[in-house]
């Protein structure tokens, strides 16, 4: 190890292990470390080190950003304990050495994934810089997870292996073993089944032209399929794959939109597939479009198995309408270890505006400009005292209540529940390990309202999040709290169903829905 590298080693370890007594001092130390890194980038006389120095100079923003991510985790993650903190420190030191001389953009991205995955926060994510060409390439075939096994779920026309064939090996190694050895390090969620499902989804993209070998079982024989990561991310949505038909495809659909699909199952039975909990405007759609279709159904099935989550309040509002319990409050769901809140909330508001996310309407964002401008200053971790934080948070909350018309929403709920009086209906909810975020909370609400859950545990990845923009223009999502239900942590456990049912590969191939079959046979 050269003197320069040894100096960098010492200063990096100093960053990791010195106890920081204030965030102001902490920020100064980070800046000091970065300055040392930059100073030592050009101090070798050898050609080899000069070439590596050139890469390090080009990677300066990534080096700084990895340090930023490390500091954000240390400051805001509610999931740190002695074991996780030790793993975080070791992983940061390992990756900070790797990233300095890494030229592959895809690998650089994975280093941020790895650092995030250490803290076991299933709600975390890293997003590549917006507006740039991502280094992600997809396979011309896809695999999925069901009941402990993996199978071919879609493919291009020239692939002859039958859909639904079980994947038994990857690169001549047992599938599960390969995923644990090569993919698990990128996966933050640890909930059973959600973890396995996330691994196989993560396998579907990698760096350009990387090759991979799949071995499927077809008619009791092993059949190999060699593939290349060749489809750019920007094109993947335009590729027409052959897919296994969904079991929804054979149901009688009577309504469809971005937010909902309604199916008439049989006389007096309706299935409402809720695709997301994204936007308060979907409450208007639910009241005006969906409820009139449900009046003649005594049995309602709410399906959130493929729900992408977002805002828990939306799900709670839907349940209030359906049950008629418009004044109910859920006290069994609470938060724990909520870290310093104001800075990430302000930074998140700034990120929402900067990236044009459609979660807050434009007029409201304009009125929040004062707070958003404060967020630019807060990036230096110049935190306020707790009492001052609470005061400003209350101002923001009141502002959002006023301009996002929350009070009007409550009035709509009460009016709809009284008008349609559908709360005497039998309600069942289908859950899955694929549905987290607001779906975890939705399942909690159902438990409190004695609504039966059928399916698997939810994903176990919920809670308020902060969005942090890094120097290299990556965006990072971090949980800011632990969410508890009846004093049990939801993270990496999920909410358990009343009746556990999981699809098998045969169910999926045959368009058979065991959850729906159970309801029809037992009600």
What are these regions (language model features)?
Residues 311-509:
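Conserved acidic, small-residue-rich alpha-beta core segments centered on
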Residues 44-337, 342-355, 426, 441, ...:
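Flexible, low-complexity junctional segments that flank or bridge functional domains
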Residues 24-31:
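Bacterial N-terminal signal peptides that target proteins for export
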Residues 5-6:
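Cationic, low-complexity basic patches in intrinsically disordered or flexible, solvent-exposed regions
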Residues 33-36:
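Gram-negative bacterial Sec-dependent N-terminal signal peptides
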């Amino acid at each position: 190890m050269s003197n320069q590298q040894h100096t960098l080693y010492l200063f990096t370890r100093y960053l990791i292990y010195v106890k920081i007594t204030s965030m102001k001092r902490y920020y100064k130390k980070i800046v000091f470390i970065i300055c040392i890194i930059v100073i030592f980038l050009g101090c070798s006389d050898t050609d080899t080190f000069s070439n590596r120095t050139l890469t390090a100079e080009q990677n300066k923003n990534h080096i700084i950003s990895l340090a930023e991510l490390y500091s954000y985790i240390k400051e805001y993650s509610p999931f740190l304990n002695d074991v996780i903190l030790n793993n975080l420190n070791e992983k940061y030191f390992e990756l900070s050495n790797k990233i300095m001389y890494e030229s592959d953009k895809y690998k650089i991205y994975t280093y941020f994934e790895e650092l995030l995955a250490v803290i076991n926060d299933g709600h975390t994510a890293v997003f590549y810089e917006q507006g740039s060409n991502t280094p992600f390439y997809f396979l011309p075939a896809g695999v999925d997870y069901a009941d402990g096994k993996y199978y071919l779920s879609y493919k291009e026309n020239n692939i002859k292996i039958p859909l639904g064939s079980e994947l038994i090996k990857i690169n001549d190694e047992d599938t599960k073993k390969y995923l644990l050895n090569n993919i698990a390090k990128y996966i933050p969620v640890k909930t059973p089944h959600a973890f396995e499902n996330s691994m196989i989804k993560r396998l579907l993209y990698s760096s350009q032209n990387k090759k991979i070998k799949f071995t499927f079982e077809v008619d009791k024989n092993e059949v190999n399929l060699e593939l290349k990561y060749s489809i750019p991310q920007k094109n993947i949505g335009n590729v027409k794959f052959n897919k296994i038909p969904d079991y929804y495809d054979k149901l009688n659909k009577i309504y469809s939109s971005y937010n909902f699909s309604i199916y008439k199952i049989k006389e007096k039975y309706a299935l409402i597939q809720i695709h997301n909990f994204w936007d308060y405007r979907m409450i208007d759609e639910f009241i005006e479009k969906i409820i009139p279709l449900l009046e003649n159904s005594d049995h309602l099935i709410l399906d959130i198995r493929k729900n992408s989550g977002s805002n828990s309040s939306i799900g709670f509002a839907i349940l209030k309408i359906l049950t008629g319990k418009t004044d109910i409050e859920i006290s069994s769901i609470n938060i724990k270890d909520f870290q310093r809140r104001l800075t990430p909330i302000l930074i998140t508001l700034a990120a929402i505006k900067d990236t044009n996310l459609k979660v807050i309407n434009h007029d409201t964002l304009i009125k929040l400009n004062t707070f958003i401008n404060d967020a630019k200053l807060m990036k230096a971790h110049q935190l306020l005292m707790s009492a001052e934080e609470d005061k400003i948070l209350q101002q923001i909350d009141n502002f959002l209540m006023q301009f996002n018309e929350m009070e009007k929403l409550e009035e709509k709920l009460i009016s709809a529940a009284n008008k349609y009086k559908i709360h005497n209906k039998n309600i069942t909810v289908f859950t899955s390990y694929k549905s987290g975020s607001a779906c975890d909370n939705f399942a909690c609400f159902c438990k409190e309202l004695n609504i039966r859950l059928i399916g698997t545990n939810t994903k176990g990845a919920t809670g308020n999040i902060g969005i942090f923009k890094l120097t290299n223009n990556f965006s990072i999502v971090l949980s800011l709290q632990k969410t508890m239900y009846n004093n049990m942590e939801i993270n990496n456990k999920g909410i358990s169903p009343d009746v556990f049912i999981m699809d098998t590969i045969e169910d999926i191939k045959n368009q058979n829905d065991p959850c729906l079959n159970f309801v029809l046979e037992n009600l």
